[in-house]
From Swiss-Prot, chain A:
Family: Belongs to the adaptor complexes small subunit family.
Protein name as it appears in the record: AP-4 complex subunit sigma
Domain of life: Eukaryota
Entry keyword set: Coated pit, Golgi apparatus, Membrane, Protein transport, Transport
UniProtKB/Swiss-Prot annotation, chain B:
One Pfam family of this chain: Adaptin_N
Subcellular location field: Golgi apparatus, trans-Golgi network; Membrane, Coated pit
Protein's recorded name: AP-4 complex subunit epsilon
Protein transport is among the record's keywords: yes
GO cellular component: AP-4 adaptor complex; clathrin-coated pit; Golgi apparatus; plasmodesma
GO BP, sorted A to Z: intracellular protein transport; vesicle-mediated transport
Function, in words: Subunit of novel type of clathrin- or non-clathrin-associated protein coat involved in targeting proteins from the trans-Golgi network (TGN) to the endosomal-lysosomal system.
Residues covered by region (Disordered): 690-712, 725-867, 880-912, 919-938
Segments of skewed composition (Polar residues): 694-706, 808-821, 892-906
Keyword Protein transport: yes
Species name: Arabidopsis thaliana (Mouse-ear cress)
Biased composition (Basic and acidic residues): 764-779
Organismal lineage: Eukaryota, Viridiplantae, Streptophyta, Embryophyta, Tracheophyta
Keywords associated with the record: Coated pit, Golgi apparatus, Membrane, Protein transport, Repeat, Transport
Repeat (HEAT) residue spans along the chain: 118-153, 154-190, 192-227, 234-272, 321-358, 359-395, 397-431, 454-495, 517-556, 562-601, 874-911
């Protein structure tokens, strides 16, 4: 299945964006997010950007105060996911300009729209920034 | 520090779309952003729930307002609270004509609902309508929703339209239609089985996005059925070749790497197709070789591709050259300073070791470094590697290490895994039984509640069977050592239940066997156990049975039994126990104490746990007795079945012992002990082979508290007693009968699978242990890898790779620049161009990671930030100059200065305007949570 979820959580452990590609109940999500954040926060920058958690592997990357965490299956290429995160951040940066946590909070739906373009069924389907952003730009223009 | 840095920093608010949002929304976001604790956040969200509940009921809510409400609902759920009261509004919004609103509606619905939610039915209709829309973005939105919401039942409602859309003129639509089909295939393969040819067709789509997406379903299809897709091998190879030759539009480049994510997917597919297929592997070898040569190992993405190549090579049948290239790549990974790369290297090693077992040897020191690294992730990965390379020569070192690690961690999930690996390795490679028992003790002591119950039975069996054949002396030594180790451990607080069961059993069987420990000493210990774990009935049951054995052995050997006062009170307590099982055991024990030596010996012969018990199901030994009874006028027995003519009832009647009831009623428990009376010592039995019976009873033992649970041991000896408490006709006869001896010894009829196989292995070889607890790495290396290595090796190797690393960094920039001119003319849609070239000069990742370092350290980080502002070109597409200089500015004062060199001039200005706007609305950067404003890429 590849990607099982994508989370953006800040240093205080507050969720800023959550997208799950398999169904989890609210309680499960809450618990999962808490556990993962605790694990990732406990790590330092020299350590691997990968953490095993239950049957997930978490690939995470920190930008300023925000952690991007992607839960993947065991046979996923971790380095590629790490770069996927960066591609996502670059894409958001291209759209928002100097993207920060607040951008994502104020434009939650747009961040989701980008993800919708990039990932479907837990697979990476689009990696061209132009293609990812063009529907969003078109929508912006229409308003 | 962080605050200082951010205070006065300009708000770099989103540059797009203006602020349609209301003050209320801004306030909500602001307060959530500033919440300092989960509790505070919860309070905010809960009051928001109240507000929205009221608002949503208001009449005539303007659409824009409604969209905002929907987003607020998304927030509520994202922060862990129920927003189901508003789902229906999200559903309604999907009906809207306005694209943005519609898409927001779809988004919210996909976030809120799972595919089986009742509301979905209300959306299917909308989806159908939207699939027909002239606006391709509307179609895309509907296809997105399909990928999240359509379940098996609703597939037919949209399938024809989706298939039609596969030929849509817009590539975005084709791509999403393919993914919708992919989703259908996952949900219900049969629903699209006639359509799989479409995936092949779309592979040739002239849009690379569609082609790339098609690889996802193809990967699934090929993993399910490799052989049907062998014809595509050359297509995939040729696509990969074209990608690496930069034939795709430049917009797919990522950090100068052409379409890396597509390359990786292709490599994954090739790994499937080339597995065990020499022909396919040969076709691939060329392009794989090229990749190894071309891939830029100075960037993360280049390494990601290299790693995927290694994986591919470990799956296919590679030629020696490729293997060598893979090994080289791995050694580069391992020599890197980056933990991520080391991790990938260890993983690659684990994969390659299957095909070339020698490869690990040259990296032994690197492996040991990783093993000793404080980074848990790396350590685990290394354990995985060690697990894969375990053999009888290094099993002791590896398992010892694993156990140490197992003891040190708290994560139950992983603890279970590593415990079962230890057990597996120990069972497979144990050099001696003694060692095996030691290892098992440790596993039980520290992870006893996590291991499979079978493991406990294996251990008991091993101790009982010992080395087998002839070496009785060694057997008793082994048992004594087990007993001694348990006596030591037994007083430890809070031992796992399973372990206590093993301990009790072994102490009961062998505690006094050697004569070293007195019966009262052992029985005292057993009472302590029953006492200390009084809530665990299973353990208590084991303890009582062990006591019974101890006393039985004493009585049988003619000694007088002094029941300790604490034992006496334990027995009395259990006689009144609520657990019928414990009660029965206690009564049995009490009864046994009253018997004479000869009877007791027959009931519980010494060291007879391994004897096979033959059960005469037909109870033929009773014939004489029955005959006698009939002759003296008794009525012949008519079975229940015959009497009532009803079949069902029979099973419920214990008298019918010709059939072991398959029901799990209590009767079974009474019957179980029957097979036991084991004979080894005494000698007059008529055995009837009955293997299946044995195994049947063997299994449930452990799992339940039913009295049969202990049958593995007790089954063997309870019968004599049982006749008094069990059903008279049946039990007594068994007891009498089973005194029949035969050459039952040694013939093992146990069919309990896991047990047999494992217990036999460790027996086979006893190798002298090498001393391996040497702290020095090379020693460790030698014991792990069997090779020799010295300190100097270590130094030279680490000395060797540092400079290498340095050069790698430098060279990193060079080839990139060389590459740029070679690139084909930029394709349309490439926005990233202008800055991309500047970024080539540096590895953006190194920079970024440096930044992350600095921002994470609290002390003095502002200075570090200052330093970094010189080395600013961080991202490819956006200049981060501005951010960084802003950062350093802000640390000095609150004033803002324009940075002329920012490539984002207009944006900064825009941001400034927005800043003012936001300030007006009350969002103030000086507030509690300044990191909110921090640029992510900065």
């Amino acid at each position: 299945m590849g990607i099982r979820f994508i989370l953006m959580v800040n240093k205080q452990g507050q969720t800023r964006l959550a997208q799950y590609y398999e169904w989890l109940t609210l309680e499960e999500r809450r618990a999962l997010e808490g556990e993962i954040v605790r694990k990732c926060l406990a790590r330092n920058d020299q350590q691997c950007s990968f953490v095993e958690h239950r049957n997930y592997k978490i690939v995470y990357r920190r930008y300023a105060s925000l952690f991007f965490m992607v839960g993947v299956d065991d046979d996923e290429n971790e380095l590629a996911i790490l770069e996927f995160i960066h591609l996502l951040v670059e894409t958001m940066d291209k759209h928002f300009g100097n993207v920060c946590e607040l951008d994502i909070m104020f434009h939650l739906e747009k961040a989701h729209f980008m993800l919708e373009e990039m990932v479907m069924n837990g697979c990476i389907v689009e990696t061209s920034k132009a293609n990812i952003l063009s529907p969003i730009q078109l929508m912006d223009k229409a308003h | 520090m962080e605050q200082l840095k951010t205070i006065g920093r300009e708000l770099a608010m989103g540059s797009q779309g203006g602020f349609g949002q209301s003050k209320e929304f801004l306030d909500l976001v602001k307060s959530i952003g500033e919440a300092r604790s989960k509790a505070e956040e919860d309070r905010i969200v809960l009051s928001e729930v109240d507000i929205l509940k009221r608002r949503l009921l208001e009449p005539d809510i303007p659409k824009r307002k409604m969209k905002e409400y929907i987003i607020r609902l998304v927030y509520i759920e994202m922060l862990g609270h129920d927003a189901s009261f508003g789902y229906i509004y999200a559903v309604k919004m999907t009906h809207d004509d306005n694209l943005l609103l519609k898409r927001t509606g779809y988004l919210a619905v996909t976030l809120f609902l799972n595919e089986d939610h009742d509301l979905i039915i209300l959306i299917v209709n909308t989806i159908q309508k939207d699939l027909r829309s002239d606006n391709y973005l509307v179609v895309c939105a509907a296809l997105n929703a399909i990928c999240r919401l359509i379940n098996e039942e609703t597939i037919p409602a949209v399938l024809p339209q989706v298939v039609e859309l596969l030929n849509h003129q817009k590539e975005a639509v084709r791509k999403k239609a393919i993914m919708a089909l992919h989703r259908f295939h996952r949900k219900s393969p049969s629903s699209v089985s006639h359509l799989v040819s479409n995936f092949r067709k779309r592979l040739c789509d002239n849009d690379p996005g569609v082609m790339g997406a098609t690889l996802c379903p193809l990967f699934d299809l090929i993993s399910e059925d490799v052989n049907s897709y062998k014809d595509l091998v050359s297509s995939f190879v040729s696509i990969l070749k074209q990608v690496t030759e930069r034939r795709l539009p430049k917009s797919y480049d990522y950090h100068q790497m052409p379409a890396p994510f597509i390359q990786i997917k292709l490599l994954k597919i090739m790994a499937l197709l080339g597995s065990g297929d020499k022909n396919a592997s040969d076709i691939m070898s060329m392009v794989l070789g090229d990749l190894f040569r071309k891939c830029d190992s100075s960037t993360n993405i280049g390494n990601a591709i290299l790693y995927e190549c290694i994986r591919c090579i470990s799956c296919i049948l590679p030629n020696p050259k490729l293997l060598e290239a893979a090994a080289d790549a791995i050694s580069k990974f391992l020599k890197s300073d980056s933990h991520n790369l080391k991790y990938m290297g260890i993983d690659g090693l684990g994969r390659l070791i299957k095909i070339s077992p020698d490869i690990a040897e040259q990296h032994q020191l690197a492996v040991i470094d990783c093993l000793e690294d404080p980074d848990d992730t790396l350590k685990r990965k290394t354990f995985e590697l060690l697990y894969k390379m375990t053999k009888s020569s290094n099993v002791e070192v590896i398992v010892d290490r694993m156990i140490d690690y197992m003891i040190s961690i708290n994560d139950n999930h992983y603890k279970t895994e590593i415990a079962s690996r230890c057990v597996e390795l120990a069972e497979q490679f144990a050099p001696s039984n003694q060692w095996f028992i030691q290892i098992m003790n440790k596993v039980f002591e520290h992870a006893g509640d996590l291991v499979n119950i079978k493991v406990a039975h294996n251990l008991m069996r091993l101790i009982a069977e010992g080395f087998g054949e002839d070496d009785d002396d060694a057997d008793s030594k082994l048992r004594l050592s087990a007993v001694e180790s348990y006596l030591q451990l037994i007083s430890e607080p809070k031992l796992p239940s399973l372990f206590l069961q093993v301990i009790s059993w072994v102490l009961g069987e062998y505690g006094t066997a050697d004569g070293k420990y007195s019966a009262s000493y052992i029985s005292g210990k057993l009472c302590d156990v029953a006492d200390a774990y009084s809530s665990d009935e299973t353990v208590k049951g084991y303890a009582v049975s062990a006591l019974m054995k101890i006393y039985a052995f004493e009585i049988a050997s003619g000694r007088k039994v002094d029941v300790l006062p604490e034992c006496q009170s334990l027995i009395e307590e259990l006689l009144a126990s609520h657990s019928t099982d414990l009660q029965q055991r206690a009564y049995e024990l009490q009864a046994l104490l009253a018997l004479d030596a000869r009877a007791v010996e027959t009931i519980l012969p010494l060291d007879a746990s391994c004897e096979d018990i033959e059960v005469d199901k037909d109870l033929s030994f009773l014939n004489g007795y029955i005959q006698q009874a009939i002759e003296s006028g008794a009525q012949p027995y008519i079975s229940e079945r015959e009497r009532s003519g009803m079949f069902e009832t029979t099973d419920y009647h214990p008298q019918d012992h010709h059939e072991v009831p398959t029901h799990a009623l209590r009767f079974e428990a009474y019957e179980l002990p029957k097979p036991s009376v084991p004979p080894q010592a005494s000698n007059e039995l008529v055995p009837v082979p009955e293997p299946s019976y044995y195994s049947e009873s063997h299994q449930p033992i452990s799992t339940s508290l039913v009295s049969e649970r202990e049958s593995s041991e007790i089954k063997l000896r309870l019968d004599g007693v049982k006749q008094k408490w069990g059903r008279p006709s049946y039990q007594s006869t068994t007891a009498a009968s089973s005194t029949t001896p035969q050459a039952a010894n040694g013939i093992s009829t146990h069919s309990d699978a896991g047990v047999g196989s494992s217990s036999s292995k460790p027996r086979s070889s006893y190798e002298p242990k090498k001393p391996e607890i040497d702290p020095e790495k090379q020693r460790l290396a030698a014991s792990l890898f069997g090779g020799s290595s010295s300190r100097t090796d270590k130094r030279s190797s680490s000395g060797g790779h540092k400079p290498a690393k340095g050069t790698a960094n430098k060279t990193a920039t060079v080839p990139k620049e060389n590459q740029t001119p070679v690139q084909p003319p930029p394709d349309l849609l490439d926005f990233g161009e202008p800055t991309a070239t500047t970024a080539t000069a540096m590895d953006p990742f190194k920079e970024l990671e440096g930044l992350m370092d600095s921002s994470s350290q609290d002390g003095g980080s502002s200075d570090v930030m200052g330093l970094y502002s010189d080395a600013a070109p961080v991202t490819t597409t956006t200049s981060v100059d501005s951010l960084l200089s802003e950062l350093s500015d802000s640390s000095k004062g609150n004033s803002r200065t324009y940075q002329p060199q920012t490539s984002k001039g207009p944006n900064t200005k825009e941001a400034l305007e927005k800043d003012a706007l936001v300030r007006q609305m009350g969002v103030n950067p000086t507030s509690q949570n300044p990191t909110l404003f921090k640029d992510l890429l900065g």
